[in-house]
Amino acid sequence: MKALVLPEPGKFEIREVPTPVPGPQEVLCRIRAVAICGSDPEIIRGGLAGTWPPSYPFIPGHEWAGEVVEAGEGVWDFKAGDRVAGQAHKGCGYCRNCLSGRYNLCENYGRPETGHRHYGFVSPGAYAQYNVYSIKSITPIPAGVSFREGALVDSAGVALHGLELSGVTTGGTVAVIGPGPIGLVTVKLAKTMGAARVIMVGRGARLKASKKFGADLLVDIEKEEPVESVRRYTDGLGVDEAFECSGAAGTFHQAVRMARKGGRVSLLGVPPGSLMEPLPFKYIVHNEIAIFGSRANPNVSGKVIHLLSSGQLKGKDLITHVFPLTEFDQALDTFVNRKDGAIKVLIEPNGPEES
């Protein structure tokens, strides 16, 4: 099979590699669509080498959808031909966090001998024609949800998990920092969950695109001071919830300052590993600002698929570009440099879905 392989940090190439064989409680899947995530360029560059990935050569990619080709031993609820969407995390299943449903925080992270998997980060990923997955990391998708839309389940789940952690005040005002794919979905779902107003903070074409997803007010960071503008839009009070979806320097501090007294801040964006910021501790304490770190998307894939199938979340609005695996270099360049209004850029390792 063909796969995108990282032979060493900073390099990638399309290679012929052996098709993997599913083990117990695993399925072999044909990858029909895989989306480029913001973490992928960093993994490819090698900025996290030694952790993501732990060694080379390595196949990245974790936001995918496809179909089951072969079921391993002990699999009875999936069969060849089933359409599925994947998520990156699969916990060991027996540590305290896994037993409480927080498998995204598995105590045995990075130890495959315990059963832990983090596909596309630590375990082989989806930039390939086929890959093997635990049945605990896949969710069925109905015929009404395309493979391309199914490849959005993982990233949309990140937004939903962050929203569920902090909650959304019915009739309240929300600020979202960062109009990338996760931020845009956060806008849409915040309105779905009852927010009366959503303020999007960002820049460029993606900021303008957030109107399509339900943003009521836009704050352009290239033209105005974000905290002052959000405060002005809320009569000086601040927002009920602020969602940081960019991971950029300075935005955590901004999110805290945007929150009203008793407000909540949810951190969805993944900052660079070296990023350190001074925090307004006195402000946080005196105003009882609740802060939530939000990692990945545990236990929400089924909900996201229902949102897609019902039309409440329109995946097609996020997908701007689609490339074959052989044009990954062009796809990556389009994504990283936001060319031609790029939002979500997809790869189809096995060609386009039949209409």
Tell where the protein language model's regions lie, with residue ranges.
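C-terminal hydrophobic helical "lid"/dimerization subdomain
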Residues: 1-3, 253-257, 298-355
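Glycine-rich beta-strand-centered segment in the early N-terminal region that forms part
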Residues: 18-34, 48-99, 142-144
